[in-house]
């Protein structure tokens, strides 16, 4: 019986050691992170409503200076970002959708960057950044997460498209 308890305990310790740890990430002063979920989808493709929403995103951010656009490699995310990328003359940089926040913030201090994500990576991003309130998980939600020159974080939520 003691051996079974020992092995069970050892198994739990090993399992805990293999569990990824999410570390807190800080937005550098002067940095703006714009977060949006991909448009409406059918499988991995955008529906006509999703295509319209992608165009609406480009219109909503037409006057916003954006330095970099990041997305997962899913077609629906890239298709959501394409009209905006084209309008701004930017490429879309794909990032694996696990542990996104440190990957997209690295080397972007003082810049404005856009993340076109999914429910499964936007919600953890909110947690990693220590943000309160609801993450922008609905179609048409648009979040502007800003760190002012002192590093104080503010979040402005808006909607775009119909």
Regions found by a protein language model. Name each.
Residues 5-20:
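N-terminal export signals
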Residues 20-109, 121-162:
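Active-site-proximal alpha-helix that buttresses catalytic centers in soluble enzyme cores
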């Amino acid at each position: 019986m003691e051996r079974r308890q020992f092995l069970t305990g050892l198994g739990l310790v090993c399992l805990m050691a293999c569990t990824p740890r999410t570390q807190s990430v800080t937005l550098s002063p002067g940095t703006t992170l714009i977060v949006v979920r991909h448009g409406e989808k059918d499988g991995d493709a955008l529906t006509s409503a999703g295509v319209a929403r992608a165009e609406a995103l480009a219109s909503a951010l037409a006057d916003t200076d954006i330095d970099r656009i990041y997305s997962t490699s899913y077609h629906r995310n890239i298709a959501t970002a394409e009209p905006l990328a084209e309008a701004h003359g930017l490429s879309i940089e794909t990032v694996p959708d696990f542990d996104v926040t440190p990957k997209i913030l690295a080397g972007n201090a003082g810049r404005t960057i856009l993340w076109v994500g999914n429910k499964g990576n936007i919600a953890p991003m909110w947690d990693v950044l220590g943000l309160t309130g609801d993450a922008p998980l609905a179609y048409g939600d648009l979040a502007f997460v800003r760190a002012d020159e002192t590093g104080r974080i503010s979040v402005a939520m808006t909607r775009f498209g119909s």
